[in-house]
Swiss-Prot record:
Nucleus in keyword set: no
Subcellular location: Cytoplasm
Keywords: Cytoplasm, Methyltransferase, rRNA processing, S-adenosyl-L-methionine, Transferase
Known function: Specifically methylates the guanine in position 1207 of 16S rRNA in the 30S particle.
Gene Ontology MF: a single term: nucleic acid binding
Any one Gene Ontology cellular component term annotated for this protein: cytoplasm
Catalytic activity: guanosine(1207) in 16S rRNA + S-adenosyl-L-methionine = N(2)-methylguanosine(1207) in 16S rRNA + S-adenosyl-L-homocysteine + H(+)
Keyword Signal: no
Protein source organism: Aeromonas salmonicida (strain A449)
The organism's place on the tree of life at top rank: Bacteria
Family note: Belongs to the methyltransferase superfamily. RsmC family.
Entry protein name: Ribosomal RNA small subunit methyltransferase C
Gene3D superfamilies attached to this UniProt entry: Vaccinia Virus protein VP39
Primary subcellular site in the record, as a coarse category: cytoplasm
Length: 342
C-alpha cells in the first residue's frame, strides 16, 4: 500500500500529461512517493535531494535515479525541470542556478508548491531564465507554474553561493561559511550562543548532532584542542557548510550524513546539539524525541548530553526518563540549556 501524497503532489497528479516522455530532473522539497509515478511517465527520471532522510526512504525503490548531494554537475542532458518549492527562497535560487546548466535550450521549467510557501514568487525566480511563466493549475492551496528556458545560462559556481560571517562565542572567534537554507547561515542564533556560553570544557570524542553550518562543533573544537569532533546532519547543504567552516578555521573534524542515529557507530564522551525544531511540524519533534531517548546508547560511561531548546518545549521529562541526572545549566525567558548524564 502506497503512502499518502502531499497536496502539491495531488495537484501534480492532475497534470500528468506535462511530464510524459520527458527527460525529467526533479529537485526541491520532496516529501512523498510521487516521484515513483513520475518514473512511469517520463522517458527518464533523475531525483536530486539534499535531504538524507528522504533519500533513505526512496533509495530502495528509485535506485540510481535518486541522488543525495549538495551539488549536481555535468553536461546538459534534461529537457524538463520540476522544482518543488523549498521553504527558503535563497535555496530555490541556488537550485535553479545549479540545475539550469543541466537543461537543454527550450527545456520546460515547472515550479510547484504551496501558496503560503512562496510559490507565487515564481515570476521573479524564473525571470533570469526565460519569459513570464504560465500558471498551469491552482488546487488544494497549491500552484503550478510552467516556463521555458529561453535565456542563456551561466555555469554554476558553488563558491559564489556561500554566505560568510564572523561570530564570537565567549572568547572564541570563528569564521562561518554556509549555503542557502542552512540553519545559522547568516548569524549565530541566540540558542546556540547560550549553549556555547554554558557548555563545560571537553575532552575525548564529541558528536555535534544537527550541525547546520558547523558553528557548535567548530567552536568546541577550537576551544578544546585535541577534542575529536564528529558532525552529522540530514542536509547535504549543511554538511558541505560544516566542512567549509572547519576548513577555513584550520580545524579537524569528521562530517557525515545521518538520519538521527542511522549512520552513527561507536560511543562519544559528549553529544551536543541545538536540535531542529519548527513549530507545527510533528516530524521534527518526533525525530528530536528519538534523538534524546536513544542518546544514552551512544554515550560512554560518565558521558553527557548538552542541548539547548525553546523554553516551552517539554524535553525535560524525556531526558529525566532516559538519563540518571538532568540539570538546567542556563536559561532565560526563551531558552533552556540541559545537561544530562548517563
Amino acid at each position: 500500500m502506497s503512502s499518502p501524497i502531499s497536496a502539491v503532489s495531488q495537484m501534480l497528479e492532475r497534470n500528468q500529461a506535462l511530464f510524459v516522455g520527458k527527460r525529467l530532473l526533479v529537485c526541491g522539497t520532496l516529501e512523498d512517493d510521487y516521484p515513483r509515478q513520475l518514473a512511469e511517465l517520463a522517458s527518464s527520471l533523475t531525483v536530486f535531494t539534499t535531504d538524507y532522510c528522504y533519500y533513505r526512504s526512496q533509495q530502495a525503490t528509485l535506485g540510481d535515479a535518486i541522488l543525495f548531494d549538495h551539488q549536481l554537475g555535468g553536461a546538459p542532458r534534461f529537457d524538463a525541470l520540476l522544482l518543488l518549492m523549498p521553504k527558503a527562497k535563497a535555496e530555490a535560487q541556488y537550485l535553479l542556478a545549479m540545475m539550469t546548466p543541466l537543461l537543454e535550450a527550450g527545456a520546460d521549467l515547472f515550479l510547484a508548491g504551496e501558496n503560503r510557501g512562496g510559490i507565487n514568487g515564481a515570476d521573479k525566480l524564473l525571470a533570469p531564465y526565460g519569459n513570464k511563466p504560465v500558471k498551469r493549475d491552482s488546487a488544494r492551496r497549491c500552484s503550478l507554474y510552467h516556463g521555458e528556458l529561453s535565456k542563456p545560462v551561466i555555469p554554476f559556481e558553488l563558491d559564489a553561493w556561500f554566505s560568510r560571517y564572523e561570530c564570537k562565542a565567549g572568547d572564541t572567534e570563528l569564521t562561518v561559511l554556509a549555503l542557502p537554507g542552512v540553519f545559522s547561515a547568516d548569524e549565530l542564533d541566540p540558542g546556540s550562543q547560550m549553549l556555547l556560553a554554558a557548555v563545560p570544557p571537553m575532552t575525548g570524542e564529541l558528536l555535534d548532532f544537527g550541525c547546520g553550518a558547523g558553528v557548535i562543533g567548530s567552536v568546541l573544537a577550537k576551544r578544546n584542542p585535541g577534542l575529536e569532533v564528529k558532525m552529522v546532519d540530514i542536509s547535504a547543504l549543511a554538511l558541505e557548510s560544516s566542512r567549509r567552516t572547519l576548513a577555513i578555521n584550520g580545524l579537524q573534524g569528521q562530517v557525515q550524513a545521518s538520519d538521527v542515529y542511522s549512520d552513527i557507530t561507536g560511543k562519544f564522551d559528549h553529544i551536543v546539539s541545538n536540535p531542529p525544531f519548527h513549530a507545527g511540524l510533528k516530524t521534527f519533534y518526533a525525530a528530536t524525541e528519538t534523538f534524546l531517548a536513544k542518546a544514552p546508547e551512544y554515550l560512554s560511561a560518565n558521558g553527557g548530553l548538552t542541548i539547548v531548546a525553546n523554553a516551552f518545549l517539554r524535553y525535560q521529562p524525556i531526558l529525566e526518563t532516559h538519563f540518571k541526572r538532568t540539570d538546567i545549566i542556563s536559561s532565560d525567558a526563551k531558552f533552556k540549556v540541559y545537561l544530562s548524564k548517563v
